[in-house]
């Protein structure tokens, strides 16, 4: 049948279509190191660790076209102990997005994203430099951002919410 890969805002649950895949995804992994590599032109989010812990992402470059929708840079979701440092990120959406599940799925999993440090990163272009939410139904706790440069982003640091989604930022 006709199956189509769509941008997130075009996806309709239950229809015969699918979201485009992230470039790199980890799921329920521990002790992850992503270091010194470059990424460009992902079909969707670039790096998306989910339900993982002890993650270090350092010295990477992400360069995605400014007109490409849903091409976030780094999107930890329901992760613990994440250190992102010395990264250069230019994207068509948000540079770094802290997530913890969407709506009922996030509330049911009840896994917060916590203990996140973001240091010495350069974020050029994109909607937001560091964004918390809006997919944060499982809560977000203890985020530290230091010595980062936001140049050409619509906003540097943003907390994004959505009515009815739920979630707490501490």
Language-model features: where?
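Extracellular/periplasmic carbohydrate-active domains that bind, remodel
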Residues: 1-170
């Amino acid at each position: 049948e006709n199956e189509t890969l769509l941008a997130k805002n075009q996806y309709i649950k239950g229809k015969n279509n699918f979201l485009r895949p992230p470039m790199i995804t980890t799921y329920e992994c521990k002790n992850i190191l992503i270091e010194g590599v470059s990424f460009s032109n992902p079909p969707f989010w670039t790096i998306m660790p989910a339900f993982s812990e002890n993650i270090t992402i350092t010295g990477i470059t992400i360069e995605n076209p400014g007109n490409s929708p849903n091409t976030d840079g780094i999107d930890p979701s329901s992760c613990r102990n994440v250190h992102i440092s010395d990264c250069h990120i230019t994207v068509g959406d948000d540079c770094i997005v802290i997530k913890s599940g969407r709506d009922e799925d996030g509330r049911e999993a009840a896994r917060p994203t916590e203990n996140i440090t973001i240091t010495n990163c350069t974020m050029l272009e994109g909607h937001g430099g560091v964004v918390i939410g809006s997919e944060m139904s499982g809560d977000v706790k203890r985020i530290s951002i230091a010595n980062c440069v936001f140049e050409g982003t619509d906003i540097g640091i943003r907390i994004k919410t959505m009515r009815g989604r739920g979630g707490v930022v501490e």
